[in-house]
Curated annotation (Swiss-Prot):
Stretches assigned to coiled coil: none
Taxonomic path: Eukaryota, Viridiplantae, Streptophyta, Embryophyta, Tracheophyta
GO biological process, alphabetically ordered: proton motive force-driven mitochondrial ATP synthesis
Family from the record: Belongs to the ATPase alpha/beta chains family.
Keyword hit for Repeat: no
Source species, domain of life: Eukaryota
Species per Swiss-Prot/TrEMBL record: Actinidia deliciosa
Major site of localization recorded for this protein: mitochondrion
Designated name of the protein: ATP synthase subunit beta, mitochondrial
Subunit record text: F-type ATPases have 2 components, CF(1) - the catalytic core - and CF(0) - the membrane proton channel. CF(1) has five subunits: alpha(3), beta(3), gamma(1), delta(1), epsilon(1). CF(0) has three main subunits: a, b and c.
A Pfam match: ATP-synt_ab
Subcellular localization(s) per the UniProt record: Mitochondrion; Mitochondrion inner membrane
């Protein structure tokens, strides 16, 4: 494992860009994601791995990972429109993309053991198969009715559902 300093967070800077070309995987930590309170602040769009292949991971894992990246990229592309015109001017499909992307972002905040010092939340282990199934469920819209805050700093999808029920009860009281 090597750490590479990226001047001014510019991944296109010639020095780090040349180095990245020789690596099998890169994990990019993002100040913007950290500012959202999501730890570890890994940017799933800028991070790469040569192992992200259906031949290595299997079709389901690969397709889910690419689906997550696609939704997050579409959300990123909508950021300027949202900043200028607001959410109300988006099409219904774009609003759905934004809602799912925000849930995915928050679900990526799962309390990892290495992030306990930053979050104060105990680390949790979530099985790979459960993670894949849960993210696919978000992509498929199975959890569209759950509030995005229920996806923040939880372990598996059962915790998301339980947290959503708790939020619902608290808001009804």
């Amino acid at each position: 494992v090597q750490a590479i300093y990226v001047p001014a967070d510019d991944l296109t800077d010639p020095a780090p860009a040349t180095t990245f070309a020789h690596l099998d995987a890169t994990t990019v930590l993002s100040r913007q994601i950290s500012e959202l309170g999501i730890y570890p602040a890994v940017d799933p769009l800028d991070s790469t791995s040569r192992m992200l292949s259906p031949h290595i991971l299997g079709e389901e894992h690969y397709n889910t990972a690419r689906g997550v990246q696609k939704v997050l990229q579409n959300y990123k592309n909508l950021q300027d429109i949202i900043a200028i015109l607001g959410m109300d001017e988006l099409s219904e499909d774009d609003k759905l993309t934004v809602a799912r992307a925000r849930k995915i972002q928050r679900f990526l905040s799962q309390p990892f053991h290495v992030a306990e010092v930053f979050t104060g939340a105990p680390g949790k282990y979530v099985d790979l198969k459960e993670s894949i199934t849960s993210f696919q469920g978000v992509l498929d819209g199975k959890f569209d009715d759950l509030p995005e805050q229920s996806f923040y700093m939880v372990g598996g999808i059962e915790e998301v559902i339980a947290k959503a029920e708790k939020i619902s009860k608290e808001s009804a009281a």
